[in-house]
Amino acid sequence: MTPTPHLLPPPGPPSRRTVLRWGALGGTGVALGPLSACAGPTGAPGPGTLTLGLNRSLVSLDNKLNQFDAAVTVQRAVRQALTWIGPDLQPRLVLADRFEMTSPTAWSVRLREGVRYSDGSPVTVGDVDTALRMYGKVNGSFLLGLFPEMPTVEATGERTFLLRTERPVPVLDRLMANIHITPAKANRPEELQSGLGSGPYRVVSANGGAGEYTLARNTEYWGKQPPVDKVRVRFVPEESSRVIALRSGELDVVDTLTPDSAEQLAGLPGVAVQETPGVRICQLFYNFRKPEGHPLADARVRHALTYAIDGESLIRDVLIDSAEAAEGVVPLALQGAVRTGTYAYDPRRAKALLKSLDAEDLRITIMWESGEFAGDTSVMEAVVDMLKDVGVRASLRQFEPGGDILKWRQGRGGDWDVIGNGFPGTTGQALTSLQGMYGGTAEKERTRDTYMGYVIPRIERQLSDAATETDAAERDRKLAALQHAVWDTWPSLWAFAPKTLLARRDRVQGLALQPVNSYDLTAVRLEG
């Protein structure tokens, strides 16, 4: 049973940390100045307008390359898929009213009658076919790695078709929740800048460079009209600015909060904080493109370095208990996930092992994109100090949102050693996350479509065998063995599963934060 989101209780007297933080902010008026100057239109939202403040820039309403969870809330309001993953992490029907496995390698699908785009044109079988082909051609796509293979479309009627695969893909109904449908004539194998979709909202204005959008009700929407007239999306990278703007009423909802900010907001008049367990894993993942002979190409060295990291202190003192240390290679909240081990802190052992492996005096570069997870900079700085204590010199490289970190992830931008990265559980299944991270092949690596260069043939074969197993119990057994095998390759220096935190004004009602760190905009209403 998936725990339901809940409101955090009002705090007791403010902690010293909170008092110091508020003192540093210097007051509402001061903070709103720079926010207003750099983040677009200001002032309290109108009575029918919902304003969202995102911590990362939403460069497109197309999800082919966008990877951060909160973007899904907005993208799905404009474009829709055949299915979606509900709050119970089970697939639900959207554009399809039938989605059934009819053989191990075929699924029968029927489009819902009357589904249409915001320009009034119908959603067609050809649009689904084109969407799958366009997603399949995008280089560097996070979503592409989730599919063991991309299905093909075989039309069987005006609204019906078969999705066929060479081998069984028993979770295809879940995977298709990631494929947003666009009119075929407007779709291309790239991140689309246009916003035509079948969702409850249409795009009124868009500035992908600034991460700002205005959405209005889609009067042609085939379903029930949403309660909110207009939605404004703003990119506000500084968390302190998001907090102040929420308190002042300039923003209605802010996502991905640190515990400090949640503590500041909980119990304030007119503000509520929501928390739910998450299905995202955040990792300090090793670069698996290192040549033979490099210390990090040796799993024993990767393992030795993990003893340098005091994960308990990071959880308690830096993340303030807003996360749980990973006990597996995927979050345990995912269906099919199993415990495979824990990260142990033992700096003496780290030093001894590194010395025995002739890997003393290592120098490593750790990179990440700002906003990858709440408190990311503080975590990275603490990790540098911990590595220093065992004789490893680490340098940090931080990328701003919207930059070229994708090239670096693919090994095209330059060399690095460890990356701070979050991987979402978009389908609620451990299998999908395992496929996306550990299903790399030599063929995928030629186009840099692997996860940080992770290509271990025996792991891929084991994963492929599990992924095509149609018997659920047998699949879970194979997946359990696979997860232990992956753990033994030591893919991460450290990893954790963050809880999902969100804050909203009291006038925002009906917002149900889901474990995938998004929510359904059609359920949100404004009161007062």
Regions found by a protein language model. Name each.
Residues L52-G53, I366, K388-A442, K478:
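Periplasmic binding protein-like
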Residues L54-T102, R133, L196-G197:
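N-terminal lobe/hinge region of extracytoplasmic solute-binding protein
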Residues Q90, R174-P226, K230:
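Gly/Pro-rich hinge or "lid" segments in bacterial periplasmic/extracellular proteins
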Residues E100, L144-K185:
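Surface-exposed binding/hinge segments that line
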Residues P189, T219-Q264:
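Ligand-site clamp/hinge motif
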Residues L296-D385, G453, A481:
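Append "and occasionally in soluble cytosolic enzymes with long acidic Gly/Pro-rich linkers
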Residues R393-D404, Q435-R505, G528:
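Extracytoplasmic/peripheral linker and loop segments enriched in polar/acidic and small residues
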Residues L502-G528:
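Long beta-strand-rich cores associated with HINT superfamily self-processing modules
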